[in-house]
Amino acid sequence: MAGGAVVSTGAGKDYPGKLTLFVFFTCVVAATGGLIFGYDIGISGGVTSMDPFLRKFFPEVYRKKQMADKNNQYCKYDNQLLQTFTSSLYLAALVSSFFAATVTRVLGRKWSMFAGGLTFLIGAALNGAAENVAMLIVGRILLGVGVGFANQSVPVYLSEMAPARLRGMLNIGFQLMITIGILAAELINYGTAKIKAGWGWRVSLALAAVPAAIITLGSLFLPDTPNSLIDRGHPEAAERMLRRIRGSDVDVSEEYADLVAASEESKLVQHPWRNILRRKYRAQLTMAICIPFFQQLTGINVIMFYAPVLFDTLGFKSDASLMSAVITGLVNVFATLVSIFTVDRLGRRKLFLQGGAQMVVCQVVVGTLIAVKFGTSGIGDIPKGYAAVVVLFICMYVAGFAWSWGPLGWLVPSEIFPLEIRPAGQSINVSVNMLFTFVIAQAFLTMLCHMKFGLFYFFAGWVVIMTVFIALFLPETKNVPIEEMVLVWKSHWFWRRFIGDHDVHVGANHVSNNKLQP
């Protein structure tokens, strides 16, 4: 066993719990669901910057790219069909996340992961064999269904398996796997772009099957969470599983009783989608909408989706564009590791606020550097030393995101919902995230063409707004068991007005005295 820890909640209860090897390895396997999301984020920008890919599927963009030295650098990739290739995945993920909520609740978290991995695997095969744009788009839609299922189930699974004190660290494993997937994709793009025969893009797209196979096979060996087992009518199995994941020498009776109470209460809710609109859940609903909305308006996916395209737009050569994307991918991974080891010590709020401030400064600097060299005309070139400074500040921006809004944008929504609305809440979180990921992916190249360097100021302004929002409206949630989170909202200066005294409860003694309205 790994080192044990008593979970001090700060909210009135202490659940004893250890980080057992069993929990560690199950969380690692589950977190690999992030690989498929990360691989896709990293692969699309590199592939769309490859000339053989553009010649075959997007010849108009290829012609504009060849003439870019004499024309506006900002606009050479502006093409709605090219943007649809990237963005269609996220629209599919948005829709599928609602179906995933039902699968996650009725069949369990692991089968939702399995469905996501299998669908992604089929989509990867179709994309690798694509002969026309229609095949590409259909493949992307299947990839999106896989991402929707994985993103809906993995964060919930990790939050339910982890001891409260270590929930942040283990949950951020999902974001770490996303960053590893991005980095792997960028390295693969760098290698496949050198294939002289021109079919390197097929290798890049087809290798998405590797992370898909990992989560598909891995999910078959995952146990169900105690929360899911209780909710699906297997209380004895749930108690055995809770004892196994907390440690055989740990008294889990109090935590088990509270999980049973939460499940009994959740079963009184016949319409969770309607129930989540109730006044007492206003705080959770607001966070489930605002946090993923703000996460996308940090502008991070401008860098992650289109890094090679962006660097090529700034005048980098093809090799340099792909290598600069690899550098940002490395920064992304290492900064996420920083978050893993600090989130349960420093807390969620401090990381959100520090990361926000860092991103604002870097975006303003990058926008200014681009403005000085390209102005509004988009005509110019960028010296090597100047380019290095641009890459440096982009890397600092990526680091700020990677230890704040990147992991916390998934962690915080996954840990704030009570069981009775958890699948519905996580589906809202994923669908909002995918909706605005779709919007950014579909609109970015057009926005870059029209807003030019001002696009970076646009995103910086949004980061200021979201940082103020966090400072005012998000309470600290570290070390608090999920079933006790209501105490955190009740003590907050703003959200307490939405929560009546009869809504504040912790533990098994509550259910018999409180009947939820459907």
Curated annotation (Swiss-Prot):
InterPro entries: MFS_dom, MFS_STP/MST-like_plant, MFS_sugar_transport-like, MFS_trans_sf, STP/PLT_plant, Sugar/inositol_transpt, Sugar_transporter_CS. Pfam families: Sugar_tr. It comes from the Eukaryota. The chain crosses the membrane at residues 19-39, 81-101, 118-138, 141-161, 168-188, 203-223, 291-311, 323-343, 352-372, 388-408, 428-448, 453-473. It is a multi-pass membrane protein. Keywords: Membrane, Sugar transport, Symport, Transmembrane, Transmembrane helix, Transport. The keyword Repeat does not apply. Gene3D superfamilies: MFS general substrate transporter like domains (1.20.1250.20). Residues 1-18, 102-117, 162-167, 224-290, 344-351, 409-427, 474-518 are cytoplasmic. GO terms for cellular component: membrane. It is found in: Membrane. SUPFAM superfamilies: MFS general substrate transporter. One of its GO terms (molecular function) is monosaccharide transmembrane transporter activity. Residues 40-80, 139-140, 189-202, 312-322, 373-387, 449-452 are extracellular. Highly expressed in roots. Expressed in xylem and sclerenchyma cells of roots. Expressed at low levels in leaves. NCBIfam families: SP. Mediates active uptake of hexoses by sugar:proton symport. Can transport glucose, xylose and 3-O-methylglucose. May be involved in the accumulation of monosaccharides required for cell wall synthesis during root development. Belongs to the major facilitator superfamily. Sugar transporter (TC 2.A.1.1) family. This is Sugar transport protein MST3. It comes from Oryza sativa subsp. japonica (Rice). The gene is MST3.
